[in-house]
């Protein structure tokens, strides 16, 4: 998949801007605060229906503008074109169109244009809260597995309903039979989600190892899944997972009623990243964290490509910061032949297959 052209109107710093990257590696360079990242964010909107760093739609308006408009033209690896339009008007929900047809749900865009990102904000994936790592798994799986996205959206609805019911049992003494029904529904969806996540982590690890080796990193990487249902949940056969989780919910039912929330399930699970058998977020330096995250994203890019048969767009914000020249060259080597990569940087970068564009030339 590649971006042929994108137009920004009243988006962030840009009243109007047109950007047409090369089919390989494009580096958009310029000083901090000049609007480079805004271009990546606009592309991200057209692929995943939201901003790069989870900004609110209204925060993306250009100064006093009442609306913004993004129009992107993409082509898959077979050359078939796809147009995406995202329009937002202040105090009105944004609208998304694919080939002029308005989407009924934003989720219909997910997976149509595979996209992998790297951003300094995403360091929280490694050293932040479990929510960041769950979001990482959900985003990756939702782009490659439509049934996972459907299960995830349904799980969130059932979870909300069950939490409401837990509160009603606590406050009004409602009968628990209804709670059992919703627990079964939640558990069925939870088992599907956890099984897919475990399979995803296993596949991702296979891709991380060679990336580490090719980047010349000395550590031995590792990744594991931590279930809120108990430390042995990962080891249970898929056909036995439902019974295990139902039993777990029965054991903690009194706590859940007291706290009015579901205390087990994939919405409370976590990932643990390691190298040399130590937790990355506890012992890694800032430079090691950054390099580890880049390796994970390079591995994810290859995984998505192999899974979908379509090379995803690669959006990399401030990629070269805090990296030495040797490491930068190795990363660029990894990106060669990987499809289209759009990188932002403060300085021009030249190399094989690299086209550098000054942000000033786009304004």
Curated annotation (Swiss-Prot):
Signal peptide: none
Annotated positions binding ATP: 30-37
Top-level taxon of origin: Bacteria
The UniProt record lists the keyword Cytoplasm: yes
Compartment(s): Cytoplasm
GO cellular component: cytoplasm
Covalent S-S links between cysteines: none
GO terms of molecular function: ATP binding; single-stranded DNA binding
Main location: cytoplasm
Coiled coil: none
Keyword DNA damage: yes
GO biological process terms, semicolon-separated: DNA replication; DNA synthesis involved in DNA repair; double-strand break repair; SOS response
Gene3D superfamilies per record: P-loop containing nucleotide triphosphate hydrolases, RecF/RecN/SMC, N-terminal domain
UniProt record similarity statement: Belongs to the RecF family.
PANTHER family to which the protein is assigned, alphabetical: DNA REPLICATION AND REPAIR PROTEIN RECF (PTHR32182:SF0)
Protein name: DNA replication and repair protein RecF
Protein species of origin: Chlorobium phaeobacteroides (strain BS1)
Lineage of the species this protein comes from: Bacteria, Pseudomonadati, Chlorobiota, Chlorobiia, Chlorobiales
């Amino acid at each position: 998949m590649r971006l042929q052209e994108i137009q920004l109107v009243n988006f962030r710093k840009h009243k109007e801007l047109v950007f047409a990257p090369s089919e390989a590696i494009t580096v958009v360079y310029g000083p901090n605060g000049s609007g480079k990242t805004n271009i990546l964010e606009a592309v991200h909107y057209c692929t995943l229906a939201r901003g790069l760093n989870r900004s609110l739609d209204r925060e993306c308006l250009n100064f006093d503008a009442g609306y913004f408009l993004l129009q992107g033209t993409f082509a898959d690896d077979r050359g078939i074109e796809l147009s995406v339009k995202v329009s937002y008007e202040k105090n009105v929900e944004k609208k998304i169109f694919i080939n002029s047809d308005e989407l009924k749900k934003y989720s219909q865009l997910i997976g149509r244009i595979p996209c992998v990102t790297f951003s300094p904000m995403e360091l929280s994936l490694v050293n932040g809260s479990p929510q960041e790592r769950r979001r990482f798994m959900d985003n990756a799986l939702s782009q490659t597995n439509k049934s996972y996205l459907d299960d995830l959206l349904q799980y969130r609805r059932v979870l909300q309903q069950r939490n409401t019911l837990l509160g009603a049992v606590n406050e009004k003494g409602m009968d628990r039979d209804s709670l059992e029904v919703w627990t079964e529904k939640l558990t069925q969806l939870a088992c599907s989600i956890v099984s897919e996540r475990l399979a995803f982590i296993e596949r991702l690890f296979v891709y991380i190892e060679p990336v580490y080796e090719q980047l010349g990193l000395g550590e031995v990487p590792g990744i594991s899944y931590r279930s809120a249902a108990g430390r042995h949940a990962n080891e249970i056969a898929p056909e036995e997972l439902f019974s295990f989780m139902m039993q777990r919910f029965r054991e903690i039912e009194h706590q859940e009623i007291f706290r009015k929330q579901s205390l087990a399930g994939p919405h409370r699970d976590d990932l643990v990243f390691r190298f040399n058998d130590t937790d990355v977020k506890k012992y890694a330096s800032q430079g090691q964290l950054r390099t580890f995250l880049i390796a994970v994203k390079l591995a994810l890019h290859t995984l998505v490509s192999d899974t979908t048969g379509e090379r995803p767009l690669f959006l990399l914000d401030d990629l070269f910061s805090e990296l030495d020249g040797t490491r930068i060259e190795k990363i660029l080597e990894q990106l060669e032949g990987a499809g289209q990569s759009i990188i932002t940087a403060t300085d021009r970068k030249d190399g094989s297959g690299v086209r550098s564009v000054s942000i000033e030339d786009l304004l």
